[in-house]
Amino acid sequence: MPLELTQSRVQKIWIPVDHRPSLPRTCGPKLTNSPTVIVMVGLPARGKTYISKKLTRYLNWIGVPTKVFNLGEYRRDGVKQYSSYNFFRPDNEEAMKVRKQCALAALRDVKSYLTKEGGQIAVFDATNTTRERRHMILHFPKENDFKVFFIESVCDDPTVVASNIMEVKISSPDYKDCNSRENAMDDFMKRINCYEASYQPLDPDNDDRDLSLIKVIDVGQRFLVNRVQDHIQRRIVYYLMNIHWQPRTIYLCRHGESKHNLQGKIGGDSGLSSRGRKFANALSKFVEEQNLKDLKVWTSQLKSTIQTAEALQLPYEQWKALNEIDAGVCEEMTYEEIKDTYPEEYALAEADKYYYRYPTGESYQDLVQRLEPVIMELERQENVLVICHQAVCVCLLAYFLDKSAEEMPYLKCPLHAVLKLTPIAYGCRVESIYLNVESVSTHRERSEDAKKGPNPLMRSNSH
């Protein structure tokens, strides 16, 4: 029997299929030369879990398989009923044993994730406030040849701490049976006091001079960075230096309906249809009603987004990075035309929409890399309206909603709707606002071929 063939992502050559176990297809290229354990450090209510989840979302979005291991969840699995802050007293020897066992269980799962499940980065989300605990954790990656990077969140502003407790902590499962918010707040403050007595901050000038770390001070007002080891740690540092905790709103919308939308064509640079111009006027009215202070407006460099923004009568910035995905030889063709002219390309695109790259064009994976500077700048901003294109919109939305590479191309971003994104404690709230202007639908559902996975005779021509 002939060998099954597949095509190398790097070179367009047919090679025998390798049936040995491999990393999940969502991983793409490995961006780390050895697995990394990120160890969070800091008192409770300092934003460690916020940083852990946000950083994990970013790393997964850029193609680095990452998972959070939250010690609080392990503790709640091991101790079904939370009684009070007394569990966290340093002189509660029985509880200390339980907490250590929970930490060891979490580290065992970290090892499994990084060695057997295709993970590249594990985030160990716990207080880790003593040197003794951190030395125990350091022994684990040394045994397994993992790199370690510490992230310490330091905040002495009582207003920020109280806000974090009220927004996140008192609604945690620990306090589901608590009879009042005040009692929960009081218990949590006493829990913090238990940790404060033995807290030993990271000290890169003395005891911790050899550790790779970043200290995030006062929710990003200052940073201290020490001994960054590699490319991925530099990206982590850069990301953490760009995010902020201030309330803001991000609006995503596509341009008004274009002439190519009406014709069912992809790509190109056509202007707005009459309904597209009507949407642009409706968007202008919507933005005015929002009464947003210092709203920034971003567009691509293509006609449809610029014509949509012109109706707002507001300053706007053009980003080449926001241009629609490049369909290469398939630009300005309908899907039916692509199917007739390039049947193999059509089948490959349907089977593997994220990794598939149009000949001389781009894949969604390429688009994510192109959009990374946009994400960094969005994280720095306050209120922003991004007027973009379908593939660009779904890539940005996937970042904020923590969607996988497989889900990304099939997210719905309809014409003539505004997606209002409001960052919240551990995620993002999304509201879809339709502006009552009719348009064609350009959404394509996942094909049956895509649901089955790639064809054995598969050319996945991305890097």
From Swiss-Prot:
PROSITE patterns: PG_MUTASE. GO terms for molecular function: 6-phosphofructo-2-kinase activity; ATP binding; fructose-2,6-bisphosphate 2-phosphatase activity. GO terms for biological process: fructose 2,6-bisphosphate metabolic process; fructose metabolic process. Beta-D-fructose 2,6-bisphosphate binds at R254, N261, G267, Y335, K353, Y364, Q390. The record marks R254, N261, H389 as: Transition state stabilizer. The active site is at D125, C155, H255, E324. ATP binds at residues 42-50, 164-169, 346-349, 390-394, 426. One of its GO terms (cellular component) is cytosol. Brain. Residues 247-463 are annotated as: Fructose-2,6-bisphosphatase. Keywords: ATP-binding, Hydrolase, Kinase, Multifunctional enzyme, Nucleotide-binding, Phosphoprotein, Transferase. Beta-D-fructose 6-phosphate binds at R75, R99, T127, R133, K169, R191, Y195. It catalyses: beta-D-fructose 2,6-bisphosphate + H2O = beta-D-fructose 6-phosphate + phosphate; beta-D-fructose 6-phosphate + ATP = beta-D-fructose 2,6-bisphosphate + ADP + H(+). The keyword Hydrolase applies. The keyword Phosphoprotein applies. In the C-terminal section; belongs to the phosphoglycerate mutase family. This is 6-phosphofructo-2-kinase/fructose-2,6-bisphosphatase 3. The lineage of its organism: Eukaryota, Metazoa, Chordata, Craniata, Vertebrata.
